[in-house]
Amino acid sequence: SSDVCSSDLHVEHVETENALAASGVPYALLRNGWYTENYLASAPPALEHGVFLGAAGEGKIASATRADYAAAAAKVISEEGHAGKVYELAGDNAWTLSELAAELSKQSGKPVTYQNLSEADFAATLKGVGLPAGLAEMLADSDTGASKGGLFDDSRTLSKLIGRPTTSLAESVKAIL
């Protein structure tokens, strides 16, 4: 939730929301949770090296796909009755990075395990493989937030809004393999 989360990314979002509310322009806020694709981008090196790196511990991640979030935006834009509302959106079924590694293993037939790193070590690793410092630090910060419950939501607001279940982790992994 942008109301309670303290990560740098969420702080920036709160400032944007406050500016929008002060503008007087009619709005509806879609607070998208984490995107499944954010983690699936790391699947190729995880499959190559047999390890999925992160700093989320066993924190539950209620991610959804870009397509799921886009469907929600389309509904809100095309239907009446959403003005002034704030929607906290997330996937239906939360998972851990250990579970993601296991799903990659199951579907690919290759062994993949999850290795949890400290936030600093994860950021340094991401920088070491070429990510810009700001992005590496934001991703490591988000993972650390996930370890504390910052990427968990069980409200099912997204699936209620789009009128169907959100895309499962298994479906998402299948789509990239």
Language-model regions: role of each:
Residues S1-S6:
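Short, small-residue-biased leader/transition segments that mark boundaries at the very start
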Residues D8-V14, S42-E48, A102-E103, V129:
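Short, glycine/charged-enriched secondary-structure capping and boundary segments
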Residues A28, P45, A62, N93, ...:
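Residues that recognize and position ribonucleotide moieties
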